[in-house]
Amino acid sequence: EKQIAKDMEDNILTDGAIKKMTLNTLFERYMATRELADTTRVSYVRAWENRVKDEIGNIKVVQLLPSHIKAYYAKLSKAGYAYSTIKYIHNLLYPALEMAVDDDIIRKNPAKSSISDYGKPAEEKEALTVSQQEKFMEFVKQSNVYNTYYPMFTIMIGTGLRCGELIGLTWKDINIKAKTVNVDHQLIYKNLGDGCKFHISTPNRIIPMTQEVAKAFEEQRKINFMLAKDKSIEVDGYSGFVFTAKSGRPLMPNGVNSVLYNIVDAYNKTEVERAKKEHRKAERLPKFSAHVMRHTACTRMAECRMDVKVLQYIMGHAHIDVTMEVYNHIGELTRIEKEIARLDSMALNA
């Protein structure tokens, strides 16, 4: 009775329907209040249904305790989920429960605790070394199977474009004479529930291209013509895509990654056979994605001591901290190399 009196005094709702509200129902109410892009909404709902709905979703909101949330995060962590995945789920739970606090359904947000102790640390995506990059590009160039992708990879390394920006490029975006690439959209492939379609977003910048990149674009146009890949298919008002499948439709991000994985597998198989014949240890390439290609491009530019603000602009980084991380990493490696060289020098002079 004292609790009821306090609830009434503090204006905490005591309606029966409110008391029976589950976390799943609260999430539905929360999503109804949000103005979201279709792709974002589908991603949120899918994450909830796959990860939360049957785990803690049926617990009544008024009975949900911080220990429930912590135990759930611990379970995800033990199952091998990364910190980023748990944080994604937390970013769904926390605001929904905060809305319940604002609506006076509960007094405190049970998700109001640190999640830093949960989840596997994200694996650091290392850029390819100069040697690895050269070996990869040379293998592609000499391959009878993959050589048609050589211009695309040259452009990826030379521009640092995001995969979505790369596959979204149209020939209208390319100015060979001025040596510029107009980046004002990217192509994102999402399953929106009612079938798969493309979504255009707009990170806007105009980036310069090197002579090598300009030559690669010219070569890509020839390849498209020779392979009859220059058909005009329109996607959300865009047509004349630079990189397409045989159908004329733009490449998919997972398609680009699949090609990269297949090339690395083929290279490593060849390298292992060659190493056996030469009686040496095989120097395999690591499995890497289009995102690592972008990180590699950023690293090469930073290694040339490109002005950090210029590099931030070229890469389209929203925050300069992201760009600075690359510079700091390079600086750290340089310091290590100098120390090793110093030790070698001391050993030789001993």
Model-derived features: where do they sit?
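Short, basic (Lys/Arg/His-rich) helix/loop patches that form interaction surfaces
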Residues: A79, Y83, E138-Y149, T159, ...
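N-terminal core-binding DNA-recognition domain of tyrosine site-specific recombinases/integrases
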Residues: K19, M31-P110, A122-E124, N144-V145, ...
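Short, polar N-cap/turn motifs at the start of nucleic acid-interacting alpha helices
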Residues: D173-T180, M306-V326
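Basic, Lys/Arg- and aromatic-enriched nucleic-acid-binding interface segment
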Residues: K87-I89, D102, I106-L169, I176-K177, ...
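N-terminal helical hairpins
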Residues: E1-K20, R34
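DNA/chromatin major-groove-contacting recognition/catalytic segments
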Residues: F136, L192-F198, C304, E325, ...
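C-terminal secondary-structure termini that scaffold catalytic or DNA-interacting sites
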Residues: A178, N191-V213, E219, I223-M226, ...
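Proline-centered turn/helix-capping motifs that create local helix->coil transitions or kinks
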Residues: V101-P110, D173-K179, F217-I233, N268-R274
